[in-house]
A protein has these predicted regions:
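Catalytic nucleophile-loop/oxyanion-hole region of alpha/beta-hydrolase
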Residues: 25, 54-79
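The serine-hydrolase catalytic nucleophile loop
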Residues: 23-36
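Gly/Ala-rich beta-loop-alpha elbow adjacent to hydrolase catalytic centers
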Residues: 89-97
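Short beta-strand element of the alpha/beta-hydrolase
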Residues: 15-23
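Conserved alpha/beta-hydrolase
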Residues: 35-57
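A short loop-to-beta-strand scaffold at the N-terminal edge of the catalytic core in hydrolase folds
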Residues: 2-11
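Short beta-strand immediately N-terminal to the catalytic nucleophile in serine-hydrolase-like folds
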Residues: 87-89, 112
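The alpha/beta-hydrolase serine catalytic core
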Residues: 105-172
Length: 172
């Protein structure tokens, strides 16, 4: 547990670690397969539960604000305890990472099925659900088949596009 964020440290002691950020409908334990591979390369893996996932089913919303706060807690710990820190992130975890870590000195990043254009994804969700921008602004929250559409979240992603990412990255 790191500052009330449930976490697992996988692998034998090393000066290298991967911060493992899972995707939607996942949890920290799903890092086990990745951690086994990373360990063969001499790396530990630090995985954790995002809000509304794993041990945090009754916690805050899993949104960019809470996700980024958790990622910063985890990275602060990682950079304080390992010499070489890399990143593995999946889906929404990659989007949160793009927001939280754009200026962090990660050695490298591995993105698995990353969400890199959240604005496009939300606009598609609105289209699929028959929701207009005006309707979302008026109602503030509208359930959809994928997830709840939220006006504040939509406004955040429009005003905070990902414009910089200087970490060497591979898309898996």
């Amino acid at each position: 547990m790191l500052d009330d964020v449930p976490s697992i440290l996988w692998g034998e002691d090393s000066n290298r670690v991967y911060v493992h950020v899972h995707g939607k409908m996942s949890r920290k334990e799903y890092a086990e397969s990745f951690a086994a591979i990373a360990e063969t390369k001499g790396c530990q893996t630090l995985s954790f539960d995002l809000p509304e996932h794993g041990e945090r089913t009754d916690s805050e919303r899993c949104d960019v604000w809470n996700g980024v706060a958790d990622l910063r807690t985890i990275s602060d710990y990682a950079f304080a305890n390992w010499e070489r820190v890399s990143l593995y992130a999946c889906s929404i975890g990659a989007y949160f990472s793009l927001n939280a870590y754009n200026a962090m000195p990660f050695e490298k990043a591995l993105f698995h099925s990353p969400i890199v254009d959240m604005e496009r994804l939300v606009k598609n969700m609105m289209l699929w659900s028959g929701v207009t921008e005006a309707e979302l602004e008026s109602k503030k929250e509208i359930p959809s088949s994928v997830d709840t559409l939220r006006w504040d979240y939509y406004q955040y992603i429009i005003s905070h596009p990902i414009t910089q990412w200087n970490i060497p990255t591979a898309i898996l």
